[in-house]
From Swiss-Prot:
Biased composition (Polar residues): 1-19
UniProt keyword Signal, yes or no: no
Signal peptide: none
MF terms (GO), sorted A to Z: metal ion binding; transcription coregulator activity
Keyword annotations of the record: Developmental protein, Differentiation, Gastrulation, LIM domain, Metal-binding, Neurogenesis, Repeat, Transcription, Transcription regulation, Zinc
InterPro entries: LMO_RBTN_TF (IPR050945), Znf_LIM (IPR001781)
Protein name: LIM domain transcription factor LMO4-B
Domain LIM zinc-binding per the UniProt entry, residue ranges: 22-84, 86-148
PANTHER family (alphabetical): LD11652P, LIM DOMAIN ONLY 4-RELATED
Region named Disordered: 1-20
Function: Acts as a positive cofactor of GATA transcription factors to establish the identity of the ventral mesoderm during gastrulation. Down-regulation in the dorsal mesoderm is necessary for the proper formation of this territory since, when present, lmo4 may bind ldb1 and restrict the availability of this cofactor for Spemman organizer transcription factors. At neurula stages, suppresses primary neuron differentiation and modulates gene expression at the Isthmic Organizer of the midbrain-hindbrain boundary.
Gene: lmo4-b
Amino acid sequence: MVNNRISESTTTAVSNNGSPPKACAGCGGKIADRFLLYSMDRYWHTRCLKCSCCQAQLGEIGTSCYTKSGMILCRNDYIRLFGNSGACNACGQSIPASEMVMRAQGSVYHLKCFTCATCRNRLVPGDRFHYVNGTIFCEHDRPTGLLNGHLNPLQSNPLQGSPMLPDQKVC
Protein backbone atom coordinates (compact mmCIF):
# COMPACT_ATOMS: atom_id res chain seq x y z
CA MET A 1 0.00 0.00 0.00
CA VAL A 2 1.39 3.35 -0.95
CA ASN A 3 -1.22 5.47 0.76
CA ASN A 4 -1.54 6.24 4.44
CA ARG A 5 -4.30 3.72 5.16
CA ILE A 6 -3.79 1.16 7.88
CA SER A 7 -4.48 -2.44 7.16
CA GLU A 8 -4.25 -5.35 9.57
CA SER A 9 -4.02 -8.83 8.18
CA THR A 10 -3.80 -12.26 9.73
CA THR A 11 -1.46 -14.81 8.20
CA THR A 12 -3.12 -18.07 7.20
CA ALA A 13 -1.95 -21.22 5.47
CA VAL A 14 -3.75 -22.50 2.41
CA SER A 15 -3.25 -25.75 0.56
CA ASN A 16 -1.36 -25.72 -2.73
CA ASN A 17 -2.63 -29.17 -3.79
CA GLY A 18 -3.01 -29.49 -7.53
CA SER A 19 -2.63 -25.77 -8.21
CA PRO A 20 0.07 -24.30 -10.41
CA PRO A 21 2.83 -22.71 -8.29
CA LYS A 22 2.02 -19.21 -7.08
CA ALA A 23 4.51 -16.34 -7.16
CA CYS A 24 5.78 -15.02 -3.82
CA ALA A 25 4.90 -11.36 -3.19
CA GLY A 26 8.23 -10.90 -1.39
CA CYS A 27 10.85 -12.37 -3.73
CA GLY A 28 8.82 -13.07 -6.87
CA GLY A 29 9.94 -16.70 -6.88
CA LYS A 30 7.60 -19.64 -7.35
CA ILE A 31 6.17 -21.19 -4.19
CA ALA A 32 6.41 -24.96 -4.55
CA ASP A 33 5.64 -25.75 -0.90
CA ARG A 34 2.61 -27.88 -0.06
CA PHE A 35 1.09 -25.02 1.96
CA LEU A 36 1.19 -21.34 1.09
CA LEU A 37 1.11 -18.31 3.36
CA TYR A 38 -1.69 -15.97 2.41
CA SER A 39 -1.64 -12.51 3.92
CA MET A 40 -2.74 -9.08 2.70
CA ASP A 41 -4.36 -10.67 -0.38
CA ARG A 42 -1.03 -12.08 -1.56
CA TYR A 43 0.95 -15.33 -1.32
CA TRP A 44 4.33 -15.55 0.44
CA HIS A 45 7.21 -17.89 1.22
CA THR A 46 7.50 -18.27 5.00
CA ARG A 47 10.94 -16.65 4.90
CA CYS A 48 9.76 -13.67 2.80
CA LEU A 49 6.92 -12.30 4.92
CA LYS A 50 8.97 -10.07 7.23
CA CYS A 51 8.61 -6.86 9.17
CA SER A 52 10.08 -3.94 7.20
CA CYS A 53 11.76 -2.59 10.34
CA CYS A 54 13.05 -5.43 12.50
CA GLN A 55 13.01 -8.18 9.82
CA ALA A 56 11.07 -10.48 12.17
CA GLN A 57 9.41 -13.26 10.21
CA LEU A 58 5.64 -12.88 10.24
CA GLY A 59 4.90 -16.23 8.67
CA GLU A 60 3.54 -17.97 11.74
CA ILE A 61 -0.08 -18.94 11.23
CA GLY A 62 -2.38 -16.51 13.01
CA THR A 63 0.27 -13.80 13.35
CA SER A 64 -1.03 -10.28 12.80
CA CYS A 65 0.83 -8.00 10.47
CA TYR A 66 0.10 -4.41 9.59
CA THR A 67 0.64 -2.37 6.43
CA LYS A 68 0.93 1.38 6.29
CA SER A 69 2.83 3.73 4.00
CA GLY A 70 4.04 0.81 1.92
CA MET A 71 5.60 -1.02 4.88
CA ILE A 72 4.76 -4.44 6.30
CA LEU A 73 5.09 -4.25 10.07
CA CYS A 74 4.91 -6.47 13.12
CA ARG A 75 2.61 -5.25 15.88
CA ASN A 76 5.45 -3.87 18.02
CA ASP A 77 6.98 -1.81 15.20
CA TYR A 78 3.58 -0.56 14.09
CA ILE A 79 2.90 0.75 17.61
CA ARG A 80 6.42 2.19 17.88
CA LEU A 81 6.12 4.08 14.58
CA PHE A 82 2.49 5.11 14.52
CA GLY A 83 1.36 5.00 18.14
CA ASN A 84 -0.95 2.60 19.85
CA SER A 85 -4.24 4.23 19.08
CA GLY A 86 -6.52 5.45 16.35
CA ALA A 87 -9.57 7.67 16.66
CA CYS A 88 -13.16 6.52 16.96
CA ASN A 89 -15.34 7.90 14.16
CA ALA A 90 -18.24 8.48 16.59
CA CYS A 91 -16.64 10.08 19.66
CA GLY A 92 -13.24 11.14 18.33
CA GLN A 93 -11.45 9.59 21.30
CA SER A 94 -8.39 7.40 20.82
CA ILE A 95 -8.69 3.63 20.46
CA PRO A 96 -5.80 1.60 21.90
CA ALA A 97 -4.35 -0.96 19.48
CA SER A 98 -5.21 -3.77 21.90
CA GLU A 99 -8.93 -2.87 21.99
CA MET A 100 -11.51 -4.64 19.82
CA VAL A 101 -13.28 -2.36 17.33
CA MET A 102 -16.18 -2.31 14.90
CA ARG A 103 -15.58 -1.16 11.32
CA ALA A 104 -17.89 0.25 8.64
CA GLN A 105 -16.85 1.60 5.23
CA GLY A 106 -13.29 2.20 6.44
CA SER A 107 -14.35 3.96 9.65
CA VAL A 108 -13.39 2.55 13.05
CA TYR A 109 -15.52 2.67 16.21
CA HIS A 110 -15.23 1.71 19.88
CA LEU A 111 -17.55 -1.21 20.57
CA LYS A 112 -19.63 1.03 22.85
CA CYS A 113 -19.87 3.76 20.17
CA PHE A 114 -21.13 1.54 17.36
CA THR A 115 -24.78 2.48 17.88
CA CYS A 116 -27.86 3.28 15.83
CA ALA A 117 -28.18 7.03 15.24
CA THR A 118 -31.93 6.89 15.95
CA CYS A 119 -32.51 4.54 18.89
CA ARG A 120 -28.94 4.53 20.26
CA ASN A 121 -29.00 0.73 20.65
CA ARG A 122 -25.55 -0.79 20.47
CA LEU A 123 -24.93 -3.03 17.46
CA VAL A 124 -22.92 -6.20 17.94
CA PRO A 125 -21.28 -8.62 15.50
CA GLY A 126 -23.99 -10.33 13.47
CA ASP A 127 -26.47 -7.43 13.62
CA ARG A 128 -27.65 -6.05 10.28
CA PHE A 129 -27.23 -2.32 9.90
CA HIS A 130 -27.34 0.40 7.27
CA TYR A 131 -24.50 2.86 6.79
CA VAL A 132 -25.87 5.95 5.05
CA ASN A 133 -23.65 9.00 4.50
CA GLY A 134 -21.47 8.05 7.45
CA THR A 135 -24.41 7.39 9.78
CA ILE A 136 -25.26 3.99 11.27
CA PHE A 137 -28.86 2.77 11.49
CA CYS A 138 -30.13 -0.51 12.91
CA GLU A 139 -32.39 -2.66 10.74
CA HIS A 140 -35.50 -1.37 12.55
CA ASP A 141 -34.60 2.32 12.16
CA ARG A 142 -33.27 2.26 8.62
CA PRO A 143 -34.23 5.33 6.58
CA THR A 144 -37.68 5.04 4.99
CA GLY A 145 -36.22 5.37 1.50
CA LEU A 146 -34.61 1.98 2.00
CA LEU A 147 -37.79 0.29 3.25
CA ASN A 148 -39.32 0.10 -0.22
CA GLY A 149 -36.05 -0.89 -1.85
CA HIS A 150 -35.30 -4.26 -3.33
CA LEU A 151 -32.38 -5.06 -1.05
CA ASN A 152 -32.14 -8.63 0.10
CA PRO A 153 -30.67 -9.48 3.49
CA LEU A 154 -26.95 -10.11 3.26
CA GLN A 155 -24.88 -12.66 5.07
CA SER A 156 -21.18 -12.01 5.21
CA ASN A 157 -18.03 -12.72 7.12
CA PRO A 158 -16.81 -9.15 7.73
CA LEU A 159 -13.35 -10.31 8.77
CA GLN A 160 -12.70 -11.42 5.21
CA GLY A 161 -13.99 -8.21 3.65
CA SER A 162 -16.71 -9.83 1.56
CA PRO A 163 -18.32 -7.50 -0.97
CA MET A 164 -21.48 -5.86 0.35
CA LEU A 165 -24.13 -3.57 -1.07
CA PRO A 166 -23.25 0.06 -0.27
CA ASP A 167 -25.95 0.69 2.32
CA GLN A 168 -26.57 -2.59 4.13
CA LYS A 169 -23.99 -4.33 6.27
CA VAL A 170 -23.67 -7.15 8.75
CA CYS A 171 -21.40 -6.54 11.73
